[in-house]
């Protein structure tokens, strides 16, 4: 229910009496999901203000709609944890990889 969402907007410092025309920046949905207003426009942290830890299950990575700096393509990957390995799944072609890890002491 969108009426139960918490919405963050910015107004460029002017006093306003209505939300009309004030751009939405972020939304915390009533189901607990935190979403940017527009895809690929917001950062979580910055180069000088970083989050200490991120606790997640699988890690979804995609730069769809943009290209990388190395070969100009885009990707969509998932990193998953196994008991003794880390796995990388290419969500575009279905190929699966294991990270080659070297134990250090």
Regions found by a protein language model. Give the residues of each.
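Beta-strand-rich receptor-binding modules of extracellular spikes/adhesins
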Residues: 1-54, 76-105
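Extracellular/surface-exposed low-complexity repeats and stalk/linker segments enriched in Gly/Pro
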Residues: 57-74
